[in-house]
Amino acid sequence: MKMMNGEDANDQMIKESFFITHGNPILTVEDTHPLRPFFETWREKIFSKKPKAILIISGHWETVKPTVNAVHINDTIHDFDDYPAAMYQFKYPAPGEPELARKVEEILKKSGFETAETDQKRGLDHGAWVPLMLMYPEADIPVCQLSVQPHLDGTYHYNLGRALAPLKNDGVLIIGSGSATHPLDETPHYFDGVAPWAAAFDSWLRKALINGRFEEVNIYESKAPNWKLAHPFPEHFYPLHVVLGAAGEKWKAELIHSSWDHGTLCHGSYKFTSA
């Protein structure tokens, strides 16, 4: 089947969706950060296809209603404090895609998310632009960002993702950007390897995803060990639930990166490929 632009629909279609841990924004200036080579070799080792657009769900945009930004050029939001001055000079001027934003809003409303709306001003927070700046440094792919609703649960976000899954048929790459674990800042660092509580949670999550047990991940509060330490607040976990829904039916999960910061912050990242 040919698209109106002459492109074959099967060539445009994307079967993959991704959950990435975006890490500490210091990685923008810290060459030795373990996430840098992962992001910098993204197109070479992880996903070589150039998407028509990117829809990224960041744990740093929390709203009451599901909201997608609808701008022509994305501003770069420096939503962090007390970092080196050079970090506040970074710009990632990726184009927006208002048409995609309106389509996301329409799809969500038709799927039961009646309060979905667009935001005509918001740019990209560091959960979006920091990894994208390294993954797609040319900033030539249109990007829309979708918010999370931390007062709701994992199943809600999974269903949100299910509604958005057809966007992949149009060449939209769906990325959830959060963290495999995201403990409180005051959680003690663990300098002798990985904290046992964090290792147990990571092991549970990895096995659940690799074995396709998404239902357990949706109700992680009753299934996961040490979840209150791993995710005392859920905003960095919910991008994963959205991506699980967007993965569609009969998906296969693959761990594409794993490293740690301070023995407690897990950089686990996953690819989900639909059948």
UniProtKB/Swiss-Prot annotation:
Cofactor(s), names only, from the UniProt record: Zn(2+)
Pfam families: LigB (PF02900)
Catalyzed reactions per annotation: L-dopa + O2 = 4-(L-alanin-3-yl)-2-hydroxy-cis,cis-muconate 6-semialdehyde + H(+)
Pathway: Pigment biosynthesis; betalain biosynthesis
Entry's EC annotation: 1.13.11.29
Entry-linked InterPro entries: Extradiol_dOase_DODA, Xdiol_dOase_suB
Cofactor note: Binds 1 zinc ion per subunit.
Keyword Metal-binding set for record: yes
Domain of life, per lineage: Eukaryota
Assigned keywords, A-Z: Dioxygenase, Metal-binding, Oxidoreductase, Zinc
GO molecular function list: ferrous iron binding; stizolobate synthase activity; zinc ion binding
UniProt binding sites for Zn(2+): 22, 60, 182, 236
Biological role: Opens the cyclic ring of dihydroxy-phenylalanine (DOPA) between carbons 4 and 5, thus producing an unstable seco-DOPA that rearranges nonenzymatically to betalamic acid.
Sequence similarity: Belongs to the DODA-type extradiol aromatic ring-opening dioxygenase family.
Protein name: 4,5-DOPA dioxygenase extradiol 1
